[in-house]
Amino acid sequence: FMVEQDWCHKGLTDLVEVDSMHERKQRMADLSDAVIALPGGCGTLEELLEVITWKQLGLYLNPIVILNINGYFDPLLEMFRRAVDEHFMRPQHAALWTVASTPAEAVGLIFSEPVWDANIRKLALV
């Protein structure tokens, strides 16, 4: 659907077309070995929170790294801490992602973080 809007990169060697944003996110997750979230807007935040939720539910098991350049994600990370403090999330949920300050650190983390077990979904209960 992004091709119809002309929102696609024309210089790619392989362009995967899908019918919806949900299908796009699912396809990206299916093809990925890890997720690195770069600073961005609403779409970036939505995709990051969705993949964290999928990991919490055992639907996505690969590493998730938040690239917190210049503290960009500090407010989001504080919200996560508050969610734990107010018992909306378990303390173990903070291990669903890791945080990097530099691109090199982010790449290193995707290779050092373990793949999660699908039984992680038992932590989905608060």
Roles of regions detected by a PLM:
Residues V51-I52, E113:
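Amphipathic, positively biased hydrophobic alpha-helical segments used for protein targeting
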Residues L38, I52-E78, P91-H93:
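Short, acidic/small-residue loops that bind anionic groups at enzyme active sites
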Residues G43-E50:
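Short glycine/serine/threonine-rich phosphate/pyrophosphate-binding segments
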Residues S32-G43:
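A short, small-residue-rich loop immediately preceding and capping a beta-strand
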